[in-house]
C-alpha cells in the first residue's frame, strides 16, 4: 500500500472556549493588534459532518461531561467536492486535554470508508485507530452537518498559541452530504462569536490579562452538542403536540357519539 501524505495528522493541546457577544468581540478586537497574526488561510469556511450511532450514543455521552469523550467527523476547509481533500478526524478529550488524530483522503474515498464499504489506498497507525472506532460503534452514520466561518490567528511570539473566532454557525440534520450546500439553521444570534484558545501549555500572561480586563470567561459549549439539544427539544415538542390526552379523546367522543 502507498503511504499517507506527510501532513500534520496529530494534535495534543488544551482548548478553552469563550462566547463573545458583539460588544465583547469589538472590545477584544481592539486589544489584540500586535499580539496575534491571522494565519495564511485568513477567513475560511469550516464544514464538518459528524458521525454517530442510531441512538446518538456519542453525543449523549459527551453531554454528560465524562472524563473521557470522543467524536468522529469528516472535515473540509471550504465546501467539499467529490475529488477534493477532506479529513477523517477522530477527536478525543481526556482530563481537559484534546487529542486529534486525522487522515487526509479525497471525499469519494472517505465516505465509503466510513460506511465500511471500502478501505483507503494507504495504511497508517492513525488509520488503524479510526477503523477500530468505526467498527466498534455499530451503525455509525452521518448525524449532523455543521458549517461556520472561521478567522484563525496565531501568536506573534509563539505560533503554537492559536486563537480562532467562529461565527455564522449553522447546522442541519437533513441532506447529510459532505459536498452539499453549507446552509443550515443558525446556532447563534448574528454578531456572536465562539472563540477557541488552543495551546500546548499555559495561556500567555498578556492574553489572560486582556480577558480579565474585559471580564471574558470560559464557557462550556459544543457546536454539535448544543445543536443536538435544540433538535432533541424540537422533536419532543412535536411529539407532545401530536399526543392527544385520553381525557380530551373521551370528551370528544362524548360530544359527537350521539349526533
Positions of predicted regions on the chain:
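Phosphate-end processing signature that detects enzymes handling 5′-triphosphorylated RNA
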Residues: 1-259
Amino acid at each position: 500500500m502507498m503511504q499517507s501524505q506527510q501532513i500534520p495528522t496529530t494534535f495534543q493541546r488544551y482548548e478553552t472556549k469563550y462566547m463573545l457577544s458583539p460588544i465583547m468581540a469589538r472590545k477584544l478586537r481592539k486589544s489584540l493588534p500586535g499580539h496575534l497574526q491571522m494565519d495564511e488561510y485568513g477567513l475560511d469556511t469550516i464544514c464538518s459532518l459528524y458521525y454517530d450511532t442510531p441512538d446518538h450514543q456519542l453525543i449523549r455521552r459527551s453531554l454528560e461531561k465524562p472524563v473521557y469523550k470522543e467524536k468522529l467527523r469528516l472535515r473540509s476547509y471550504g465546501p467539499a467536492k467529490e475529488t477534493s481533500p477532506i479529513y477523517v478526524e477522530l477527536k478525543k478529550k481526556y482530563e481537559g486535554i484534546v487529542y486529534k488524530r486525522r487522515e487526509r483522503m479525497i471525499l469519494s474515498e472517505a465516505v465509503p470508508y466510513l460506511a465500511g464499504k471500502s478501505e483507503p489506498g494507504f495504511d497508517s497507525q492513525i488509520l488503524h485507530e479510526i477503523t477500530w472506532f468505526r467498527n466498534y460503534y455499530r451503525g455509525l452514520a452521518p448525524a449532523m452537518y455543521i458549517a461556520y466561518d472561521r478567522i484563525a490567528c496565531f501568536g506573534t511570539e509563539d505560533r503554537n498559541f492559536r486563537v480562532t473566532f467562529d461565527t455564522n454557525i449553522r447546522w442541519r440534520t437533513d441532506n447529510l452530504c459532505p459536498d452539499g450546500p453549507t446552509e443550515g439553521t443558525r446556532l447563534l444570534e448574528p454578531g456572536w462569536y465562539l472563540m477557541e484558545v488552543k495551546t500546548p501549555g499555559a495561556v500567555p500572561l498578556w492574553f489572560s490579562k486582556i480577558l480579565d480586563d474585559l471580564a471574558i470567561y470560559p464557557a462550556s459549549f459544543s457546536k454539535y452538542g448544543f445543536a443536538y439539544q435544540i433538535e432533541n427539544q424540537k422533536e419532543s415538542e412535536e411529539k407532545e403536540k401530536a399526543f392527544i390526552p385520553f381525557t380530551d379523546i373521551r370528551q370528544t367522543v362524548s360530544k359527537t357519539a350521539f349526533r
